[in-house]
């Protein structure tokens, strides 16, 4: 029971506190769908997906922070005993009431400081809605929004396209 109550509190990393995850069934299912789709589409390729158990390290001017995105992709060689990434090319956050403020604020701003990052996916778990922030070589980001289950999210940065139908498979809508 002690481990469970510890998870309900805050996870700490180098003086930085991040709210513990308390995701819904939709959040969990969407996370599995996303990482499963990335894994299947990247199989045999240079880039490698990671789930929410793996953290990203972000060196800011004043401090180093660690975050646990819901999914991320790196195209660099990663040692098997590594405990974090410095250089994801894609990061995905599945939004939830308990983490939305941090995901869209502090974490989003920190992700933007990663020189390697080319795409940030912000995903609603309860209805089809994905916001893609795509970066270019000059560090500017553009926004694309996907709401139709009939569309695919193109990620040429990793040579993958994510079908919305696969991401939202087995999701029970709670909002419209």
Question: Can you annotate each of these PLM segments?
Answer:
Residues 1-176:
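Gly/Pro/Ser/Thr-rich low-complexity, intrinsically disordered segments predominantly at protein N-termini
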């Amino acid at each position: 029971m002690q481990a469970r109550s510890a998870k309900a509190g805050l996870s700490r990393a180098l003086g930085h506190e991040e709210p513990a995850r308390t995701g819904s069934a939709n959040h969990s299912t969407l996370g599995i769908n996303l990482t499963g789709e990335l894994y299947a589409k990247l199989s045999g390729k240079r880039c490698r997906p990671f789930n929410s158990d793996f953290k990203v390290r972000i060196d800011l001017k004043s401090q180093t922070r660690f975050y646990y995105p819901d999914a991320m992709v790196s195209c660099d060689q990663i040692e098997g005993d590594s405990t974090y990434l410095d250089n994801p090319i894609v990061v995905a956050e599945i939004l939830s009431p308990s983490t939305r403020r941090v995901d869209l604020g502090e974490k989003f701003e920190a992700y933007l400081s990663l020189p390697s990052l080319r795409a940030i996916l912000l995903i609603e778990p309860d209805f089809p809605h994905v916001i893609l922030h795509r970066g270019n070589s000059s560090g500017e980001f553009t926004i694309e929004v996907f709401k139709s289950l009939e569309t695919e999210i193109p990620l040429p940065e990793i040579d993958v396209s994510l079908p919305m139908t696969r991401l939202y498979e087995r999701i029970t809508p709670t909002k419209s």
